[in-house]
Structure formats: structure tokens, C-alpha cells
Amino acid sequence: MLIDSSIAQAYIESSCVDAFRASWLFEHTSVSLDLGRNAFTPPPEDLALRETVRKLERRICEAAAHFVPVNRPIWDALFPDWEAVQPTLDLIVGYPEPYDAVAAHSPDGQAHLIFDLIRWCNYAELDQLDSVIRNLLTHEITHLLIGHRYPAADAALESTDYLTRLDAYTFHEGFAHLLSYQATEIDCVDWHTPQLTEVAAASRAKLRLALMETDPDRQKQFLEEAVCGSYYEKFACMCGMLYLADRWEMQGIDGLKSAFADYHGFAQRALSIRI
């Protein structure tokens, strides 16, 4: 994995990071698409924050150098050539909340993971920081691997058709959340806790409403709530993840391979969660 920490380093060294405003990292990613503008947000001029960013930059570089994905056997099955996909990890500052980790492709088509280290300051004091890094690397690289293996599902994320986009969101986020969940191997997760049972019911109810919605303004709101907000309230992410956990429990790797074969209609299929 290549690492480009030039923006984070400029901030650490008190250089002018505003010079990076025109970079594609702020102009041409899902963040700028979500915001409808250049995503650059001037970072605070704070010495203590700079020191935290410096420590985070070092820890993330060390973890990335020795990265092993969570649920590697599933990666091996779904993405057999995953080791040939070598993304660049961009360590930056300048994204607004809540964009801490983003998968993207540069204008020349190269795969990138973008970590905003000021947003990562929320995790800086966690004892399990290495686990958080592994979780987010697994999550974001899964998005890149889906795009590499299944370009149509990737393109559908920006479709102008509401249901196509909802399918793509549920598919993409379902797999990314499943494979990275709590940085824990899938067989070691209890998918039937009272909390997850409640999350499944609430997410399924909201996804059902989203699938029936015809008003353009409400559709836009549903698409935002599908993948944004607090972790367990992102209904498309949760429905997709728990549906796939169901498939795993019933059919193992074969169930996940079958689910990966077609994103079309995935949101509707995700309503069949048994959890």
C-alpha cells in the first residue's frame, strides 16, 4: 500500500494547507458530490491538535505497512486478485465532519483511500486504535475491491435512478460493513443479540418505506439517511449487513458469493432478514 501524507505533513509542520484546496481530493470525490461544492474546510490552527495528528499519522502508517484484512478468507473468495489492487492511502486534513475515511478514484483511475486525520482525532485516545485502523482499512478497501470486481455496482452509486442507487448503497455498504464489523471475524460475531435484532427490525421498516417512496424530495432524504448518521441508524448499511450475515449463517461462503453476483434488486432482497 502506497502512502501519501503530504497534506497531513504540511499541517503538522504549520505550512499552508490552503494550497491543496484545488486538489482532486477536495474537488472530485463523493465528499464534494455530497456537499455540492469543493470539500476543503480550513483546519484549526491548534498546536495540540497538530501534535495529535502527528501521532495519528505515525500509528496509521505503521498499521498500514502490516495490514491484514478482517475476514481475509471472505476477501480471498470474493476478490481472488485483491492483493494485486494496491490503493494509495492519502493522509489529509481539510474534510468536514463526518468524513473520516473515504474510498475514491483519482482522475487517472487509480484507487485511493483518504483518511482525514483531524476527523480521526475522535479515535486518538482509544486503547483499541489499531483495531479501528484495521476496521476502517478493511471497510474502505472492500468498497474499492467491489468497484474493481463489479464496476456496474460501483457506477450505480451515482445513478440518477432512485431505486438503482438504493440497491447500490445497500449492496456496497452491506458488504463493507459485514466484512469489517467490529474488526471481528464473522464467525465470532453474535448476530442475534437483542441490539442487532432491534436494529434489524428498525432498518427493515425504514428500507421498506424507502423502497415505496415516490416523492423526489423524500427520496433524496432517504438516500442520505440510508448511509449517513450514527452507525446503527444507517438503514441501508444495516439491512445489507444483516441480510448478508443471514446468508453466511445459512450457506457460508457460497451464500455470500451468490449475493455478490447481482446488485440489482438487492435492497428488496435485504428485507428478508431473519435476524
Task: Please report, for each region that a protein language model flagged, where it lies by residue.
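N-terminal mature-domain "stem" immediately C-terminal to a signal peptide or N-terminal signal-anchor/transmembrane
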Residues: 1-50
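Post-HExxH zinc-binding segment in Zn-dependent metallohydrolases
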Residues: 15, 78, 148-206
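Auxiliary, metal-adjacent structural segments of Zn-dependent hydrolase domains
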Residues: 53-114, 130-131
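Soluble non-cytosolic domains of exported or imported proteins
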Residues: 62-69, 132, 136, 166, ...
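Extended, well-ordered protein cores
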Residues: 112, 116-118, 146, 162
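Short pre-active-site segment immediately N-terminal to the catalytic Zn-binding motif
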Residues: 118-137
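Catalytic glutamate of the conserved HExxH
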Residues: 136-148, 174
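Pan-zinc metallopeptidase signature
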Residues: 192-275
